[in-house]
Structure formats: C-alpha cells, structure tokens
C-alpha cells in the first residue's frame, strides 16, 4: 500500500488540573481525554524515488518547518533512517487555537500513518515517546484510547467512559496555549488525586478562570448558554463544550447558538477513529 486516508480526530479535556510546574517550565497536570467522532482528514502518499516530505496545503502564517505535520514526518524519518518520502494533504475542519487538539492530532496521525506505510516497525509506545517531543498531547492521540494523563501528559492510564453526545462551540478568537500556561494567575497547586476520586467528583478546568478573565468572548458565551446547559472549557480554549443525553438535545442547543458561530455536535469515542480505521487494514 502506498496511499492511505486517515481521520485526525478531535479530543476534549473532560477535566484539567494543574498540580505544579517543573524546573524546566513544563507543567505537571492531571487530565482526562476523550476522542470525538469528528476531526480533520489526512491523505498520505509515500514516494520511493526520494525522501522529500511535501505538504500539499500549507497553513497560512505557519512556515513549513514549523508545521507539526512536517515535523512529525521528518522526526520519524530521522528516527528510523527511512529513505522514503511522502506527500501529505490535510482537509482541515478543526479550528486552530481551539483546545480540541487539531495540531497534536495531525502530528499523531502522520506518525502512525507513515509508520504503517513506510513499514518502519515502531510500536505505539515508541511513537508516543517520539511524539512527546512535538507536544504534550501527541502521545494520547498516538495511543488511541480514552485515558487519564499525568506528569506532563505522557503518563497514560486507559479508561472506559460513557460515550456521550457533546456540543462544542468556539467564539471567534484563538488562544495560544503558551500564553495561558505563562499567566501568573494560573492555579498551579491543585492537589493530585487518584483517578477513582476524580471520577466521583464534579469536573473542572484550572485554565478556565484565567481564560474567562482575559477573553470576554469566552465569558460572555458561557454565561449566555447557561440557560441551556453548563458549558466548560476544553484545554486552554477557546472551545467550550457541554454534554447531552442525546444527539437531538445537543442539536437543539446548537441551533440556538449565536449567529454563524463555529461549532459541531459530536459523540465521545473511547477508541480513536484513527485506530478504528487502521484496524480495518490489519
């Protein structure tokens, strides 16, 4: 096989707590990831005549060398001394700066997809370790299962959750993750708790207060939607989400959203759509 089209799914942080900051600047956290059945789509073709990595469609304002897709392909190439190349096209549906994992998911899909097409033979654990150098969220997308993440995001405990319906909305702003994690008001001392204790609690996000203080668009949207459901932040935003018992209930609130606001209704997935697709070929 020399070509494959793979999903690059969105994720939600169902909760996110910051437990501390290491000497190297990375934050220690506890978060619960679940995948969604919506996302981007990545078309990967391999070339055997040369080792060039070609991106068919660049992201406006992002240099090729800084693009996580390109960096993921080059990283795998270097790690495995692979002499083959690739041509990669992305159909983008997820927003940048949304907190639903678009860039990290793209990087993971490329790592997993090229490992399959190039037959480089790395395990998922090896790919996840490789992906961590690209971003703290990349390993969860590589692993492909709903998981409780600790450390800086690299310590993963798979778990099963109800696959609920979610409404995800994004105000017309993008939020740089680094700006939130650098904010002096960000809580960094939330006590670590066991997964069983966290699953028994109401869930929250330590980044939400800071985001709502700095971005009135997020604050105003959450307040406006309180009449329908309690929305909360995913990641560092700007997307917010709420859970619903049915697709119909989620779509009803979606139809009441502010005019032309970006959003989607999606179902939680305990197994990543990426891995479901790859399993069809194995």
From Swiss-Prot:
Enzyme Commission number: 2.7.1.148
Enzyme class: transferase
GO biological process, one term: terpenoid biosynthetic process
InterPro entries: GHMP_kinase_C_dom (IPR013750), GHMP_kinase_C_sf (IPR036554), GHMP_kinase_N_dom (IPR006204), IspE (IPR004424), Ribosomal_Su5_D2-typ_SF (IPR020568), Ribsml_uS5_D2-typ_fold_subgr (IPR014721)
Organism encoding this protein: Haemophilus ducreyi (strain 35000HP / ATCC 700724)
Keyword annotations: ATP-binding, Isoprene biosynthesis, Kinase, Nucleotide-binding, Transferase
Binding-site positions, ATP: 95-105
Gene: ispE
SUPFAM superfamilies cross-referenced by the UniProt entry: GHMP Kinase, C-terminal domain, Ribosomal protein S5 domain 2-like
Protein name, per record: 4-diphosphocytidyl-2-C-methyl-D-erythritol kinase
Function: Catalyzes the phosphorylation of the position 2 hydroxy group of 4-diphosphocytidyl-2C-methyl-D-erythritol.
Pathway in which this enzyme or protein is active: Isoprenoid biosynthesis; isopentenyl diphosphate biosynthesis via DXP pathway; isopentenyl diphosphate from 1-deoxy-D-xylulose 5-phosphate: step 3/6
Similarity field: Belongs to the GHMP kinase family. IspE subfamily.
Molecular function (Gene Ontology), one example: 4-(cytidine 5'-diphospho)-2-C-methyl-D-erythritol kinase activity
Residues annotated as the enzyme's active site: 11, 137
Catalytic activity: 4-CDP-2-C-methyl-D-erythritol + ATP = 4-CDP-2-C-methyl-D-erythritol 2-phosphate + ADP + H(+)
């Amino acid at each position: 096989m020399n070509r494959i089209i793979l999903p690059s799914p969105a994720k939600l942080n169902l909760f996110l707590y910051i437990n501390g900051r290491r000497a190297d600047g990375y934050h220690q956290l506890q978060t619960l990831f679940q995948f969604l059945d919506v996302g981007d789509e990545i078309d990967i073709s391999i070339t055997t005549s040369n080792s060039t990595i070609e991106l068919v469609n660049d992201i406006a304002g992002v240099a090729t060398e800084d693009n996580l897709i390109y960096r993921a392909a080059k990283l795998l190439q270097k790690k495995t001394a692979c002499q083959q190349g690739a041509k990669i096209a992305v159909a983008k549906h997820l927003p940048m700066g949304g907190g639903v994992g678009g860039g990290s998911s793209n990087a993971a899909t490329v790592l997993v997809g090229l490992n399959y097409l190039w037959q480089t033979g790395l395990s998922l654990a090896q790919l996840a370790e490789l992906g961590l150098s690209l971003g703290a969220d990349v390993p969860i997308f590589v692993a492909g299962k709903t998981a409780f993440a600790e450390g800086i995001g690299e310590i993963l405990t798979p778990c099963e959750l109800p696959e609920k319906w979610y409404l995800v909305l994004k105000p017309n702003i993008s939020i740089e993750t680094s700006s939130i994690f650098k904010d002096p008001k960000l809580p960094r001392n939330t006590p670590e708790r066991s997964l069983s204790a966290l699953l028994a609690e109401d869930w929250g996000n330590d980044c939400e207060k800071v985001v709502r203080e700095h971005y009135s668009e997020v604050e105003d949207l959450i307040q406006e939607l309180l009449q329908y459901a309690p929305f909360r932040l995913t990641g560092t935003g700007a997307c917010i989400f709420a859970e619903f018992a049915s697709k119909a209930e989620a779509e009803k609130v979606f139809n009441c959203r502010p005019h032309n606001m970006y959003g989607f209704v999606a179902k939680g997935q305990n197994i990543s759509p990426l891995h479901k697709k790859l399993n069809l070929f194995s």
